UniProtKB/Swiss-Prot annotation:
The protein's annotated pathway: Amino-acid biosynthesis; L-histidine biosynthesis; L-histidine from 5-phospho-alpha-D-ribose 1-diphosphate: step 5/9
Region forming the signal peptide: none
A biological process from GO: L-histidine biosynthetic process
Annotated source species: Synechococcus sp. (strain JA-2-3B'a(2-13))
Catalysed reaction equations from the record: 5-[(5-phospho-1-deoxy-D-ribulos-1-ylimino)methylamino]-1-(5-phospho-beta-D-ribosyl)imidazole-4-carboxamide + L-glutamine = D-erythro-1-(imidazol-4-yl)glycerol 3-phosphate + 5-amino-1-(5-phospho-beta-D-ribosyl)imidazole-4-carboxamide + L-glutamate + H(+); L-glutamine + H2O = L-glutamate + NH4(+)
Origin organism lineage: Bacteria, Bacillati, Cyanobacteriota, Cyanophyceae, Synechococcales
Keyword Lyase tagged: yes
Gene name per UniProt: hisH
Protein name per the record: Imidazole glycerol phosphate synthase subunit HisH
One Pfam family cited in the UniProt record for this chain: GATase
Keywords: Amino-acid biosynthesis, Cytoplasm, Glutamine amidotransferase, Histidine biosynthesis, Hydrolase, Lyase
Chief location category: cytoplasm
Length: 218
């Protein structure tokens, strides 16, 4: 059996190098894709990203990825969004005026100012796992530390989407969402040490279980 083949979407939203290297360390064969043609042939899809909501959505739509990502999620093709790749799944964002992908009902909101609170939320913070049996959390203890860099956070209309939260000042924000074969993290697993790498391995192993022709490399 071959290695899990993951398409990493390149839409000019930040440096994808660390995400690709993390996925390769997790046992996947990674290919950067700049157009949606052939996405269905991959075992799974990864959407990393840093930056602003509106330019990201403009790039995704201009390249034809908007429809392609929605179709991939509908057919239960394994999908992992990271940071901005989580936020664009929502319907809209306070950061801009562009509509999101509308895969996750809800809106992306900015952290509320409060005394002593640093915005952006940057650095290590702990995860409260709300979907304890999610495949992403296999072998991951509650209160694991993860690395964040963001000023906005997704607020799903349905709390059942929430797979983990974190606390920034007095505000509880969504750290991860999951449903079916879709997973997304607001934090950067590829920058979150051994447990972050374990999360990426968990995703690769989940993809392998969904695709009997592939298996993660040792």
């Amino acid at each position: 059996m071959g290695a899990v083949r993951l398409a990493v979407i390149d839409y000019e939203a930040g440096n994808l190098h660390s995400a690709c290297k993390g996925l390769e360390r997790a046992g996947a064969e990674v290919q950067l894709v700049t157009e949606p043609t052939g996405l269905a042939a991959f075992d799974g899809i990864v959407l990393p990203g840093d930056g602003a909501f509106d330019p990201a959505m403009q790039q995704l739509r201009a390249r034809g990825f908007g429809k392609a990502i929605r179709e991939a999620v509908e057919r239960q093709q394994p999908f992992l969004g990271i940071c901005l790749g989580l936020q664009v799944l929502f319907e809209s964002s306070e950061e801009g005026t562009e509509p999101g992908l509308s895969i996750v009902p809800g809106r992306v909101q900015r952290f509320r100012p409060e005394a002593g609170l640093r915005i952006p939320h940057m650095g290590w913070n702990q995860l409260q796992l709300t979907q304890a049996h999610s495949p992403l959390w296999a072998g991951i203890p509650d209160q694991t530390w993860a690395y964040f860099v963001h000023s906005y956070h997704g607020v799903p209309s349905d709390p059942a989407w929430v797979a983990a939260t974190t606390q920034h000042g007095s505000q509880t924000c969504v750290a991860a969402i999951a449903r079916g074969a879709l997973f997304a993290t607001q934090f950067h697993p590829e920058k979150s040490g051994p447990y972050g790498l374990k999360m990426l391995r968990n995703f690769v192993e989940f993809v392998a279980r969904c695709s009997p022709l592939s298996a993660p490399r040792a």
